[in-house]
Amino acid sequence: MRRCLWILFFPLMAQAAGEGTWQASSIGVTLSNRGVAMSSRPLAPSEAVSGQMTLVAWNYRLIGPTPAGLIARLCSQTRCTQVDAESGTTQAFSGVSADEPLRFIWEVPGGGRLIPALKVQSNAVIVNYR
């Protein structure tokens, strides 16, 4: 019985310790030219939060093939980290204010038209903070 009570109260204790999570998502972008960087919409908490980011999980979905040389970065206002897969986690934003928005930056190096265009269906993050 005590074990069950512990499980029930654990989320409340974590919240009391100042830990939390926020998530945000947006529709993606279409990148038609090489050598041009394009940003997603800002991904920000829907309500006021305070604390420092600890772990950030990301996910994005592409429509069509991944262009050779694609560089995808996840950025705060003060730092960026390259993301090498459509989903994953990073601690690169540890210490960044939890209320700071994040955004994806998309780029395919080179010059000229990108055929087919890079089409990002969606971008999403889950931000853990303390």
What are these regions, as identified by a protein language model?
Residues 16-130:
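Disulfide-rich extracellular domains of secreted proteins
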Residues 1-2, 72:
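Short, intrinsically disordered low-complexity segments
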Residues 3-13:
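Sec-dependent N-terminal signal peptides
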